[in-house]
Design a protein with these regions (language model features):
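Non-globular targeting/processing and membrane-anchoring segments
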Residues: 1-52, 75-82, 98-108, 121-187
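Thiol-based oxidoreductase modules, predominantly thioredoxin-like and allied folds used
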Residues: 56-59, 73, 81-97, 108, ...
Length: 187
């Protein structure tokens, strides 16, 4: 996989990215952000992260799936900003990545890529977590895309948060256990 360090350095932090949306889009994102809360155990887990990680989200400010997942990822990142550096790239502006980030043959968002402290690719996840797919399967079939107009139910947000936290923790453990970084940090 090619290096995306240039994209990362030009990507936006959450607040900057949110500001690119319309007032209505911002409202939708904030609804989910307000519902997404880490419990004490989750906060303690994230606070214990020892390796720096970079998370780059290829997103669409207009996208219902992004509305329902990206604020959750922000909640995780802000629980340990010294170790988690989260940035966003707008799909409509950064079309050069479309071919490389296709999922199941389609241009989908969000696509979340995880990098080590020194910019090496570790993992890619997207466009929906397992619990997001389960919730959508219960609600509908067909080609329509969620609009994000109605906020997801609290239990759905909690399940999505747990899915993303599992992925972030998996990558953190990968970084913590890799011989290359253990040697570098002498631990």
């Amino acid at each position: 996989m090619p290096s995306f360090s240039g994209q990362f350095s030009s990507a936006l932090r959450y607040e900057q990215y949110l500001a690119t949306g319309t007032q209505e889009q911002q409202r939708r994102w904030m609804q989910v952000y307000d519902v997404a809360q880490l419990d004490a155990t989750q906060q303690q887990l994230i606070a214990g992260f020892q390796r720096e990680m970079k998370i780059l989200v290829h997103s669409g400010i207009w996208c219902g799936d992004c509305v329902e997942q990206c604020p959750v990822i922000q909640r995780i990142a802000e629980a340990n900003p010294a170790k988690i550096d989260l940035r966003f790239l707008e799909r409509e502006v950064n079309t050069e990545l479309d071919e490389e980030l296709r999922i199941n043959g389609g241009s989908r968002v969000p696509v979340v890529r995880f990098f080590s402290e020194d910019g090496l690719w570790c993992a890619t996840a997207g466009d929906r977590t397992l619990n997001r797919y389960r919730a959508l399967a219960l609600k509908r079939l067909g080609p329509s895309c969620p609009t994000g107009i109605l906020p997801p139910e609290k239990g759905e947000v909690e399940a999505t948060l747990a899915d993303w936290l599992n992925e972030v923790e998996r990558v953190q453990l990968m970084l913590r256990l890799t011989p290359r970084l253990r040697e570098k940090h002498q631990d």
